[in-house]
Every structure is written in C-alpha cells, then in structure tokens.
UniProtKB/Swiss-Prot annotation:
Highest taxon, organism lineage: Eukaryota
UniProt source species: Pongo abelii (Sumatran orangutan)
Subcellular compartments: Apical cell membrane; Cell membrane; Cell membrane, Sarcolemma
Protein name, as recorded: Solute carrier family 2, facilitated glucose transporter member 5
GO term, biological process aspect, one: cellular response to fructose stimulus
Family indicated by similarity: Belongs to the major facilitator superfamily. Sugar transporter (TC 2.A.1.1) family. Glucose transporter subfamily.
Residue numbers bearing the N-acetylmethionine modification: M1
Amino acid sequence: MEQQDQSMKEGRLTLVLALATLIAAFGSSFQYGYNVAAVNSPALLMQQFYNETYYGRTGEFMEDFPLTLLWSVTVSMFPFGGFIGSLLVGPLVNKFGRKGALLFNNIFSIVPAILMGCSRVAKSFELIIISRLLVGICAGVSSNVVPMYLGELAPKNLRGALGVVPQLFITVGILVAQIFGLRNLLANVDGWPILLGLTGVPAALQLVLLPFFPESPRYLLIQKKDEAAAKKALQTLRGWDSVDREVAEIRQEDEAEKAAGFISVLKLFRMRSLRWQLLSIIVLMGGQQLSGVNAIYYYADQIYLSAGVPKEHVQFVTAGTGAVNVVMTFCAVFVVELLGRRLLLLLGFSICLVACCVLTAALALQDTVSWMPYISIVCVISYVIGHALGPSPIPALLITEIFLQSSRPSAFMVGGSVHWLSNFTVGLIFPFIQEGLGPYSFIVFAVICLLTTIYIFLIVPETKAKTFIEINQIFTKMNKVSEVYPEKEELKELPPVTLEQ
C-alpha cells in the first residue's frame, strides 16, 4: 500500500512539470507550427513586395519565372533550415543540456523575427529569405530537443501524454497563423511584416521563463555526473523529497551505458544492437512526411472550391481544418497512455490509407458525379484526424523512448534529418506528381501509408508504461546481440528492473 502511494506521488502531474512542459512547447514547438503557415496567406502580397522592391532597384519588374523561383527559394529555406537544425541537435544538447539548447535556440527565432518585421521598411526581400532559413534552423532544433527534454522530465506514466504536447503546440501554432493570416486581420499590405515578426514573442517569453525550471535529471546524472543536481531536479519536478527510486533507475541506465560512451551518428549506424531502433525511426519519420500530409493541405483549397465553397470563404474553411487538427491532437494527449503508442500509429496510418484511397476515387469521379466533391471534403477531414492521432505526434515520442541517453541525441539527429528531408522532398516533387498523375496522385501516399502500417504491425513494440531500460531490453532480444561483442553494445542483457512497482 505504501509502495502504491509512493508510485502515485512520483507519477503525478505537478505544477512545476506542467509549467515546464507548457513553456518549452509554447516557446519552441509553437513557433515551428506558426512559421509553417505564416507565409501561406500573405504569399501574393509578399511576392508583390518582392517585385516592387526589384522595380525600385532596377526600374523594371521581374518576369514570372524569376519571381516564382525567388518565392520557391523563400518557402524552401524553411525545411532546409530545419535539416541544418537537426544536425545541430547533438552538439547543442551535449554541450548546453536540453534546457540550455532550447534557450540558445531562441537566437534563431528572435533575430529573424526582428529582420522579417523590418523587411518592408528596409525594402529588402533578402532579409525574409535569410530569416526563413534561421527560423527553419530554430524549428529543426526545437522539433527534436523539446520531445527529448519533456521525455526526460516526465515520469513513465506521463511520458506519452507530455510527449504529444509538442505536436499539440505545433498544430496550435499553425491555427494561430491561419487566424492571424485572415485578410481582415494581418494578411494585408501593412500587416504581413507584423504577421511574420510575431514569431519572436514566444521565444522572448521562453527566454525569460524557462531558466527558472529544472534541467533534465537524466542529463545531469548520466552526462554531467552530478547526482545531487539530478536529485534536486527530480524533487522539484515531482513535488516531494523521496525520489530515490527514480535516481536508482537512472543510475542503472548509466551503468548499462558505461561501456558504450557517447554514440555518434556514424557509430549509431554501425551498431548492431541499435539496428531495429534506427530503422524504426527512419521508417516512422519518413512515413510521417511521405504519407502526404503536406500534399493534403496543398490540395485542400482546390477541393473546397470544387465543392462550391466561395473563394472568399475558403480561408475560413482552411482555418476550420486547422482547428480540427488541434482538437484531435489534444485528444491524442489524453488517449496515448490509455491506448498506447503502437495502436495510435496503426489506427492513424490506417485512417490516412483509407482517406487517400477514397479521395483518389472522389477526385477521379468529381466531374461526373455531382456529390463527389463533398466526399473529397470528408476525406480531407478524415485524413487530418488520422494523422493527428498517430503519425504526427508519436514518432518523436518514440525516439525518446527507444533510445538510451548515450544514443538519444544522435537518434534525434537522424530522425530529424529524415523528417526535414522528407518534408522538403514532398514539397519539391508533389507538383510534378500532381501534373503527371492528376487525381491519382494520392495513390502514391496510400502505398506509403500501407507499407508503414505493415512495418509498425510487424516490428514496432508497445512502449506504454515501461522504463527506458525495459524498452531497450525488448529491442535487445529483437536485435539478437546478447552474445555478439557485448562489451561494445549499448545495452547488455540486464536482469528485470525491480525498482518500479
């Protein structure tokens, strides 16, 4: 009875843990979502600014091709910056810690926010292009460090819920940008620089507030070898003094990893003991982006117009779709610990698979069957719901769970790189796929959803309510490494963990 009471106290959501989660997610993840959508509504106004600026310098307007190319560079700078940011994750979290990396990362938000806010006054579209690269770097770092930080702060029974919070704030950021981007708010000639510059507000708040919250206890004990600081951080996060059980579990993880030392990206690819973990994050991160989520949003406006939504009202319907995304991700926060990660992934990718197949049929028949455009709208909403439940929030959470401390930064670097390269690839090739395949474009994404679902069903284990050691014991058996150079493996066969009741 006493042990159960102790477990309940250790696993509760305290005010400090809740505030640390909200500040980290709002200050970092929110910006990612905001900058994804911030340039969509004012795109034509910004291109007009590019042209007027060019005219002011040369006395002539740009032709269509160079203007389109310049705008494409502006948009693509964000995922390119995200890729660069992913490569910085390992060095930053190992040098500054998880919290320190987030604080340092605010440079890549506040500086470009000022530059973008001043770009129209300065008559420089180059400032916007450079700033898009910088906010991309910010997003690349935050999309990896925030899940890592929260996953290491949370007790095991809350790790899933708190791990979904970053994705929730990404969707909130998208929705806020869509609302602020309405034409009667900031998507106008005078307002669009303010719309772009607002991304610095969450960063400034995080810079002021996050220093008052603890660093990751795992980072403090395993990497800094400061058990006293780790214990103090745990006591602050858990709201009581008796944290010896958790300290012992972290110490056990530290002992298990001493033979491995720091694991670089190159070493990560060479280690047989991590092959299924590594392959799983590559498949999940690739499947997340290559399943067509960006293409759905790209195609949504056209689908709404074909269904008879007036052109001037499409912006409101698009914001409504963003609201659905927020609501379903909010639901995922509460059901991830009830249903588990594996089931949400299977359910989410399956819904996306069916939505892509039905959408293909609806698009092919919309010219001959009058009510098919309405089916297309249902498919778009269904896809958004499915992706919000599993494919969007769960992969980053799983990277935290299936890797131990020594390999986790490098794993996030790999997962983040796959995420951003896949994002960039879809944005680059989807217009060509659409031109070549027309209404059958989404068959490509349906196939990717199917293959990812099969992989999850066959390979990915459930990690709900398990310690990091217990999860890695599952993969140790899958990788069959207990007798292959055990002194060089990240985790040897360990006796069952008895610290958690």
